[in-house]
Amino acid sequence: MFSGNLKKQIMSIKQYEIWIADLNPRIGTEPGKTRPVVIVQTDLLNKIPHPSTIICPVTTNVKENTEILRIHLKKGTARLNQDCDIMLDQIRAIDNRRLIKKIGTLPNDVIDRIKENIEIILDL
C-alpha cells in the first residue's frame, strides 16, 4: 500500500495545495483509490514536519446542489484535468506516506470558500 520512505515523510506540503494521494484501502463511505486531495491542515503543522496531514478528497463524480458539502472546481483549476468536487464532508487525516505528488495550488477565491464551508460544517 505505501511506497513512501523517510524522504517522502519530510517533503514540503503546504495548505491549499492539491496532491495525488493513495487512499486505499477504503472503509464504508470513505473515498478510496488514488485521487487528488486538498491539503487543509495548517502550515504550522506542515512546517514541523508532522507525520500526518488533514485533507479533503477530490472526486470527478460532480454533484449539483451541494454548496456547503462540496466545492466545484472547473477543469484546469490548480492543473486538474477535469471538472471535480472537493468533498468537504470527507475531511480526514492521512499518513504522509499516502501523498504521491503535488499537482497545483488552489486560487484565493476557492480557498476562501473552503474556509467558509469548513466553518459551517464543523460549527466553528
Predicted feature residues:
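C-terminal terminal-subdomain/extension
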Residues: 2-11, 76-124
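Feature marks short, surface-exposed loop/turn motifs that line or immediately flank catalytic pockets
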Residues: 27, 62, 94
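Compact nucleic-acid interaction/catalytic patches
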Residues: 30-34, 38-75
